[in-house]
Amino acid sequence: MGAGLPLVLLLTLVGSSQGAGPGMTLQLKLKNSLLANSSYNSSFLDFLQKFCLLLHLPLGTNVTLHQAGSSQHVTCRV
């Protein structure tokens, strides 16, 4: 990818299923090399689920990875 834009992981914590409650967004910049080999296969969603566990995120937390031209999304189910 070279000098492409950095990957940014956005975590949105929603207080209710309708999104009407309080929320928080956390932005993390990740190295392209960390996800370069897994960004287009099914193990990438497993990576996001493990990220939920690592950060002890509450059930229903929306995790989205934004990259130039695409995004991946998972809802924490822990």
From Swiss-Prot:
<comment type="function">
    <text>Putative surfactant protein.</text>
</comment>
<dbReference type="GO" id="GO:0030133">
    <property type="term" value="C:transport vesicle"/>
</dbReference>
<dbReference type="InterPro" id="IPR028198">
    <property type="entry name" value="SFTA2"/>
</dbReference>
<dbReference type="Pfam" id="PF15210">
    <property type="entry name" value="SFTA2"/>
</dbReference>
<keyword id="KW-0325">Glycoprotein</keyword>
<keyword id="KW-0968">Cytoplasmic vesicle</keyword>
<keyword id="KW-0964">Secreted</keyword>
<dbReference type="GO" id="GO:0005576">
    <property type="term" value="C:extracellular region"/>
</dbReference>
<feature type="signal peptide">
    <location>
        <begin position="1"/>
        <end position="19"/>
    </location>
</feature>
<keyword id="KW-0732">Signal</keyword>
<dbReference type="GO" id="GO:0005794">
    <property type="term" value="C:Golgi apparatus"/>
</dbReference>
<protein>
    <recommendedName>
        <fullName>Surfactant-associated protein 2</fullName>
    </recommendedName>
</protein>
<feature type="glycosylation site" description="N-linked (GlcNAc...) asparagine">
    <location>
        <position position="37"/>
    </location>
</feature>
<keyword id="KW-0333">Golgi apparatus</keyword>
